[in-house]
Amino acid sequence: MGKLYLGFDAGTQSVKVAVYDSSWTKVASHSLPTTLGYPNPGWVQMDADEYVANTVTCMKACSDELRRKGYDPADVAAIMGDGIICGITGIDADGNAITPFINYLDSRTKEDVDAINSTPREIWGRETGNPEASCMFPAMFARWFLKNSDAFKERGVKFVHDAPYILMHLAGLKAEDAFIDWGTMSGWGLGYRVMDKVWSEEQLEILGIDPKYMPKILKPWDIVGKLTAEMAEKTGFAEGTLVC
């Protein structure tokens, strides 16, 4: 029947997984709702591991649907995904989340944003296209984690977005392999050189964020790994399927 392609969207309100054939006809799909937590006024946070669990469940539903329709899940050539570009979690050396996933709806960084913006800096607009900080920027969430998360201060290794977090777990990657694509990079708001598609050491120094915490920047179509045996068993797709 030809090659199939699996994609997911790890969004604010749901995780959606779909499989398409080579003519871009949808042949299977499934979605599950996400959970938004509001622990304090102005705070909005999620669970990165719920994103992984929902994706795995949706993938299993899709592989079952494919089999019912006479398709072979082993024909899936690649697994791809996108998610929330203005949201991050902190991970440990094993690649596991040790902080909540804070997204763009959160405003806990308002005072810090006001403090940053009290000193106008030309570099923000020149390098990122954003003239000032905003509560929705992951750069500000990173500053908050570095100041307020004991878990990250003790064991934190990288900051990652939700889609890369899911893809890392599907491929069994550790923090040393943490990544972000150059489209999602723009969601950071500050801390990068948009034209060069690299992190800005000068901006990160101003922000007080050590570059060691930043994931490597890849092309959106780069292959990051292969579906592990464990995830193959859980999802019903073939071990070794490319993850990108």
Model-derived regions, located:
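N-terminal glycine/serine-rich phosphate-binding loop of ATP-dependent small-molecule kinases
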Residues: 1-100, 115, 215-216, 232-242
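Conserved donor sugar-nucleotide recognition element shared by glycan-biosynthetic enzymes
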Residues: 48-51, 55, 109, 138, ...
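Active-site metal-coordination/substrate-binding segment of hydrolases
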Residues: 112
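Hydrophobic side chains within alpha-helical segments
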Residues: 85, 109, 141-144
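Metal-dependent DNA phosphodiester-chemistry modules and their immediately adjacent helices/loops
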Residues: 121-123
